[in-house]
Amino acid sequence: MQVLWFIPTHGDSRYLGTSEGAREVSFDYLKQVAVAADTLGYDGVLIPTGRSCEDPWVVASALAAVTRKLRFLVALRPGLMTPTLAARMAATFDRVSNGRLLVNLVTGGDVAELEGDGLFLNHAERYEASAEFIRVWRDLLAASHENGEISFEGKHVTVKGARVLYPPIQRPHPPVYFGGSSEAAHDLAAEQVETYLTWGEPPADVAKKIADVRARAAKHGRTVRFGIRLHVIVRETDAAAWAAADELISKLDDQTVARAQAVFAKMDSEGQRRMAALHAGGTRRTREALEISPNLWAGVGLVRGGAGTALVGDPKTVAARIEEYAALGIDTFVLSGYPHLEEAYRFAELVFPLLPRKVRDKLPGQVLSGPFGEVMATGIVPIASQS
């Protein structure tokens, strides 16, 4: 089991939908989150992409220099970059980070944003372009290890004699992650990616997605790994966790929710449509209505695009829900919580000990290896409470 955290390059706060409780997302703050994830033993971090975010490649490059083992899941954007340039970027990042790159193939689903970036393709065309893009990217990096070149002629991508002179550390290329809920997305995942990602839907719906992608991959003689993107709200008791969930959306008003949902409704993303359906386009606002599956809460999606659900509960409950997804075949969990610095610590301290995952080697530290809290009376090292 791999557990990744999240770098909030589009903002961070104690509350959703308001400037109250917000904090400046400077590089110093992003560095705090990354270093925390690195030292706490997270396997990596997802860096988001889009016009609401800082550029993920620049941020990842800067954070790689201040971390030791943390891996970075960074977006490839077909149509916004060429596959050959993207291959060079990926190879260089992988080399300078000593093999710590993971790539996230992002087709995009916000038509207004895509047109603002100069991409005027419909849903089907975007997936065609993405399939051609990632094929060239993969083949080019694989060839780079033997100083080879490739040529490709497609509907959206054509290259002749393409080469990457400095190959990546990882062979044949850094692992490719990809998420999408349409049939076209499932076809692309089955044929070309290493890990298929889904947003946090109820387990029964996730199981159907996994079965479909597996069946499609089998037709190509391939196996695919699976991951899930979730928020987490974990506290020492269930009551405290649900109180924290209520507090997270306590500043929302009807107008703010309606504005956000109007934007989401214009997208042609099947995944976003499925997220919106979980809370009926923002009309479900009570805790009972937003708990769409045991301990799976859709409140985040009232105003946040993309991943809109959170696991809510005490440590044992949240760990049990994670294992429920793991039993379906999920082995990568990409998590986040508000605010991201504090919640990175909280989740690692409360839930990591309960998960069936290999504990990553700790970074070098003090001779007195913790965590043990503050030393008492100048020499007494605290131990776990027996109560």
Curated annotation (Swiss-Prot):
Q: What is its EC number?
A: 1.14.14.5
Q: Reply yes or no: does the keyword Flavoprotein apply.
A: yes
Catalyses which reaction(s): an alkanesulfonate + FMNH2 + O2 = an aldehyde + FMN + sulfite + H2O + 2 H(+)
Q: Which GO terms describe its molecular function?
A: alkanesulfonate monooxygenase activity
Q: Does the keyword Oxidoreductase apply?
A: yes
Q: Which Gene Ontology BP annotations are present?
A: alkanesulfonate catabolic process
Q: Which UniProt keywords apply?
A: Flavoprotein, FMN, Monooxygenase, Oxidoreductase
PANTHER family per the UniProt record, alphabetical: ALKANESULFONATE MONOOXYGENASE, ALKANESULFONATE MONOOXYGENASE-RELATED
Q: Which HAMAP family match?
A: Alkanesulf_monooxygen
Q: What does this protein do?
A: Catalyzes the desulfonation of aliphatic sulfonates.
Name the chain's protein. Answer: Alkanesulfonate monooxygenase
Q: What is the name of the gene encoding this protein? A: ssuD
